[in-house]
Amino acid sequence: MAVPARHTSSAKKNRRRTHYKLTAPTVTFDETTGDYRHSHRVSLKGYYKGRKVRDTK
């Protein structure tokens, strides 16, 4: 079974983890409905790129 030859120090571990970052979600203003929505997603009212693509209740 493979075993690490040396103990990984906390500094080495933290330097490796510096690239694990959270990014803020991309939110855009939907001119059709007047609401904010995520980019490349259907709005809550069923519109995508200005067209009705889903029926909502």
Curated annotation (Swiss-Prot):
Protein name stated in the entry = Large ribosomal subunit protein bL32
What InterPro entries does the record tag this protein with?
Ribosomal_bL32, Ribosomal_bL32_bact, Ribosomal_zn-bd
Positions of region (Disordered): 1-23
Entry GO MF terms: structural constituent of ribosome
Q: Does the keyword Ribonucleoprotein apply?
A: yes
Q: What is the lineage of its organism?
A: Bacteria, Bacillati, Bacillota, Bacilli, Lactobacillales
UniProt keyword annotation of Ribosomal protein present? yes
Q: Which organism is it from?
A: Lactococcus lactis subsp. lactis (strain IL1403)
Which GO terms fall under biological process for this protein?
translation
The UniProt regions of compositional bias labelled Basic residues, in chain numbering, are: 9-20
Protein family membership: Belongs to the bacterial ribosomal protein bL32 family.
For this UniProt record, the keywords arranged alphabetically read as follows: Ribonucleoprotein, Ribosomal protein
Q: Which GO terms describe its cellular component?
A: large ribosomal subunit
